């Protein structure tokens, strides 16, 4: 599995990624604003953040990211998204996530939010749980892919990574790790196959998409550690 999905290994460096996973004419990761940019930085080790900067178009600078070797799995996944031949729009929204349905009609999901149910130990984390360590809940994010094959699709030709703007600093970073380094990253490394990039609910609870589960757990866990530093 680690041969096909190189970044499932904890020791993969962005500058040394296999050519098959990097497009020299790749698109970009585009944070919609400064808050989105800060959210992405907060998922990374402090020492790596200087290599994640925006270009004149507001996109993450691909050449700068590629110039740096990091042991961070989150850095590597972000780097591969930046090198993919797809545009990834990162959007904070506190009202609705706009999507296109199977008929091509636009609609939206409401960005609901529940405050934390505990107020101490913000970095409490139990591996294997998708719930945020902050205790925040609701409809906290959504990743949408181009096309009309799913019930919820991107409204345009870009991948949309929506994160609930009501989330705390920590909650935003954790949930971007779920959506960006889980769903969007799996979409990237499977050749843009949205059928492989979503949750597979099991009758006994849990997620049947083992690759996605592993990606989300490791990304969220690293983000929690990076935020504590």
Where would I find each of the regions flagged by the language model?
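Post-HEXXH active-site segment of zinc metalloproteases
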Residues: 170-174, 186-228
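Residue-level detector of alpha-helical secondary structure
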Residues: 41, 79-83, 92, 216, ...
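Active-site scaffold of zinc-dependent metalloenzymes
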Residues: 106-174, 186-187
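Conserved small-residue motifs centered on glycine
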Residues: 45-114, 124
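Stable alpha-helical elements in mature extracytoplasmic
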Residues: 36-40, 172, 176-177
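Short turn/helix-capping motifs enriched in Asx and small/polar residues
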Residues: 1-52
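Sec-dependent signal peptide cleavage junction
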Residues: 34-39, 59-61, 226-229
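Catalytic glutamate of the conserved HExxH
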Residues: 17, 175, 179-184, 188
């Amino acid at each position: 599995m680690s041969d096909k999905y190189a970044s499932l290994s904890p020791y993969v460096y962005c500058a040394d990624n296999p050519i098959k996973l990097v497009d020299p004419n790749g698109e970009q990761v585009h944070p919609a604003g400064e808050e989105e940019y800060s959210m992405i930085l907060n998922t990374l080790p402090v020492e790596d953040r200087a290599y994640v900067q925006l270009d004149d178009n507001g996109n993450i600078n691909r050449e700068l990211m590629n110039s740096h070797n990091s042991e961070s799995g989150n850095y590597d996944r972000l780097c591969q998204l930046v090198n993919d031949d797809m545009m990834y729009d990162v959007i904070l929204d506190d009202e609705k996530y706009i999507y296109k349905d199977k008929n091509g009609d636009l609609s939206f999901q409401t960005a609901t939010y529940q405050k934390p149910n505990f107020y101490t130990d913000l970095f409490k984390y139990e591996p294997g749980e998708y719930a945020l360590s902050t205790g925040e809940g609701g409809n906290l994010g959504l990743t949408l892919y181009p096309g009309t094959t799913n019930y919820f699709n991107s409204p345009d030709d870009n991948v949309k990574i929506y994160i609930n703007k009501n989330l705390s600093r920590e909650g935003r970073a954790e949930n971007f790790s779920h959506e960006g380094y889980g769903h969007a990253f799996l979409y990237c490394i499977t050749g843009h196959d949205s059928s492989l990039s979503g949750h597979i609910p099991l009758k006994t609870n849990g997620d049947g998409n083992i690759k996605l589960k592993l990606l989300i757990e490791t990304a969220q866990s690293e983000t929690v550690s990076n935020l504590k530093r």
